[in-house]
Amino acid sequence: MNKVIEWFYNFLWGDLFTLHFGDVSIGIPLLVLLLIPAGIFFTIRTKFMPVRKLPQMIRALGDKNDDKTSLSTFQTLIVSTATRVGMGNLVGVVAAISIGGAGAVFWMWASALLGASTAYVEGTLAQLHKKKDPLYGGYHGGPAYYIHDFVEQKRKKKLKKSFLAILFAFFGLICWCGISQVISNSVTSAFKNAFSIPPIYTTAVLVALAAVIVLRKNATVKFLDVIVPVMAVLYFAVTVFIILKNIKLMPGVFSRIFQEAFGFKQIAGGGFGAVLMNGVKRGLFSNEAGSGSAPCAAAAAEGKRPETVGMVQSLGVLIDTIVICTCTAMIMLLAPREITDGLQDRKSVV
């Protein structure tokens, strides 16, 4: 099983080919090859929407929801943020900086801006192709739905099913089940390492909590409405406290980020590719732009205008990477180097 997982990981994140620029080598994984050009294309086509319409993104959170069976734009942001924020914001950032240096943080920011454009397109398409749920009320949808609709448009006839939509739904199910296992495994490992609690007990508590939330109608959204803002604010507050305690070191931290992102030392040493790719890969893994998970939440929103829901999804990417990942990066870069050098696995965070 481990060999199968390792093969899939190398297929998706291993170097598909390598670009050589003098002494600099940049390995390009398959997912980076797919997601970064898509992000650049969407950014240009939307005329740099994440930067241009940031005020409108924030104002869109105040839109009222007249249909109580569907989600408001704010609730879709909460749900999509809950899907985006996870181990990538902690372990991913630690690994990116440990392997690629402080300069990887800059390339995480850059990938977030491209990912925000992708998320905008995903969210807007999910709204345009959402379906009314006759059983539970509200709406449902996502990439499988708009892929199916596009196949119908291409073939110019109604279809009961389409192979591409089924393929996406199948691999999406595998992906999201796997992600939840990664998170639960990290939680059980953390409690075992910190408090010597056997994983079976932590797992039982997690299953019980999940059952209480999932089996009650609308309990998932209500729970996330409370827990996501609280956790984000607390994490941000802790980071601000640490920054204020070390405010004199901040100019050096930002100088280190930009120097190592574009530094001649990294280029001359052939390490520029590691800085660039580790920042980009960890940024893409963290914000999930292009993975197809967040559009399912976007489709559940009432949304008077599809564009508004798309902008809120774009804001979710910026919150995930520009805010939360940066918090982790600042905490790590303010710590003494002898503590942080070489930390590449989840135990370094625990």
Give residue spans per PLM region:
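Acidic, glycine-rich loop-and-beta core segments that form the ion-binding/anion-interacting portion
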Residues: 224-305
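Selective recognition of specific alpha-helical transmembrane segments in multi-pass small-molecule
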Residues: 114-122, 202-217, 228-248, 281, ...
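Membrane-interface loop-to-helix entry segments
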Residues: 34-38, 42-58, 164, 185-191, ...
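Membrane-embedded alpha-helical segments of transport systems
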Residues: 84-90, 106-118, 167-178, 315-327
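Helix-loop-helix module between adjacent transmembrane segments
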Residues: 38-43, 111-139, 148-185, 189-213
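N-terminal alpha-helical transmembrane segments of multi-pass membrane transport
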Residues: 1-87, 97-104, 115
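Alpha-helical membrane segments and immediately flanking helix-loop junctions
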Residues: 67-99, 125-128, 135-151, 170, ...
